[in-house]
A protein has these predicted regions:
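Long, low-complexity, mixed-charge
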Residues: 1-138
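Conserved beta-strand/loop scaffold segments within soluble protein domains that form the structured core
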Residues: 2-9, 35, 90, 94-98, ...
Length: 436
């Protein structure tokens, strides 16, 4: 089967040892898929009939950033090393060769980005440029959802995949100052199932999302991935937060043979806050890949990356979480924490939390808790008539039941129940019995 390959996807900003095979991933997509447009957008007319653009919102922020930077040149020696002698002397004044440090490729790139202070050029998404181009092409057009100043809005985007097709949405969400926006995205596809993994992909569902959270706005984004195991799901997003913005992101990844979830955020202005809550499940030979990059640029900014998941069968998961405390973000704090339950010996689990720091008076915290079902626990359950397969199903059922009970509408709940029936015999009946 001929394939398209997205190489170096979901790449870490500062790579670690290559032999760990965690710096990035390669996404394989069937080349012969038909591009279709089965995307439903449920939103009030005032959210869709707008002249507001993501680029315009970023340009407005750029004006304020430039005004704040005026008259305060950055004279650090690392900029001389990154910019070169001529540009650096103009920006920083003359320095001797002994004052110029040696920089890694990442440090040089970061220093140039800081010197430019260009919000638009610094914008990024979690999976990367190639995935963004693929999803935008598959979507055909980008739809803007925007709130007015001080207004409240709610929208739902449903991406419905099918065998032999590529279906994707491309959404720009712009929350005006002091407004509230709630956005739900579902990536769902029901098919013949397949064996999971990239080789058996029956189709692709995806979402490309750009979010601008205006000053003091409140943005809530929830993404449900409930595709059957024969499908590949791509969830790529990038966020820009203005002063005092509060953004809550929930990623609930329950299905899909191969899923790639990538998110990058620019906490550009002071006192912005970002909270990420990720919940995932993988069974059989399914693959889960996550990449989170949070750049703290404003003062007293806060971020939290919290992940919780269950891995069963011969599934694989890699989670990369990078918190970048950029020069100038004094008083900021970033935290990343993961809890994963490994229900089978065949699981391949990788987690690489990373804290990058170029500022003092900041805090970066990270940790991971990995729980195994110990042999003596399985022996105890077997002595009570519970087989290892039934014990594994208990953990899977708990994750699915939580997702079904918390689903925001009946269609999402039905998709979760469909996945449950595929993994566990009689899941729907037991769930209805518990609800009764």
């Amino acid at each position: 089967m001929e394939q398209l390959k997205i190489r170096h996807a979901s790449a870490m900003p500062a790579p670690t040892w290559r032999w760990l095979h965690m710096n990035d991933t390669e996404i394989c997509l069937p080349a012969e898929l038909v591009r279709t447009g089965d995307v439903e957008i449920e939103a009030a007319d005032e959210l869709l009939n707008t002249a507001v653009t993501f680029e315009g919102a970023v340009a407005g922020l750029q004006e304020r950033v430039d005004a704040a930077r005026a008259g305060a040149p950055d004279t650090r020696a690392c900029l001389r090393a990154a910019l070169g002698a001529d540009d650096a002397e103009a920006a920083c004044g003359a320095l001797s060769d002994l004052d110029v440090p040696a920089l890694s490729a990442y440090q040089e790139r970061a220093a140039r980005e800081e010197a430019a202070g260009d919000v638009a050029r610094a914008f990024e998404t979690g999976i990367g440029t190639d995935a963004r181009s693929y999803l935008n092409f598959a979507a055909g057009e980008t739809v803007t959802i925007a709130t007015g100043a001080g207004a409240e809005g709610r929208a739902c985007v449903r991406v419905n995949g099918g065998a032999g097709t590529t279906v994707a949405s491309s959404i720009d969400a712009v929350a005006a100052p002091d407004s509230t926006l709630s956005l739900t995205i579902t990536l769902d596809a029901a098919g013949d199932g397949g064996s999971g993994g990239q080789q058996g992909a029956a189709g692709v569902v995806g979402s490309e999302l750009r979010v601008f959270a205006g000053a003091r706005s409140r943005v809530d984004v929830t993404v449900y991935v409930t595709a059957d195991s024969g499908f590949t799901a791509l969830d790529d997003s990038g966020y820009v937060l203005d002063e005092g913005a509060r953004v809550q992101v929930r990623h609930i990844v329950l299905g899909g043979g191969t899923t790639a979830t990538g998110m990058a955020a620019d906490l550009r202005s002071d006192t912005a806050r970002l909270d990420i809550d990720t919940r995932y499940l993988a069974a059989g030979t399914e693959v889960r890949d996550f990449n989170y990059v949070v750049r703290h640029r404003g003062k007293r900014t806060v971020s939290n990356i919290i992940a919780n998941g269950v891995l069963a069968g011969a599934s694989k998961k890699c989670l990369r979480g990078t918190i970048d405390l950029v020069h100038g973000c004094k008083g900021s704090e970033g935290t990343e924490r993961e809890t994963v339950l490994i229900a089978d010996e065949g699981v391949d689990n990788k987690t690489v939390p990373t804290i990058l720091c170029d500022e003092d008076d900041v805090a970066g915290n990270h940790g991971a808790t990995i729980g195994h079902v110990r042999p003596e626990q399985l022996f105890y359950l077997e002595s009570r008539g519970v087989s290892p397969e039934a014990a594994e199903a208990l953990f899977i059922r708990a994750k699915l039941e939580d997702a079904a009970l918390c689903a925001p509408d009946e269609r999402i709940r039905a998709a979760v129940v469909r996945l449950g029936d595929r993994l566990i015999d009689g899941f729907a009946e037991e769930l209805e019995g518990d609800a009764a």
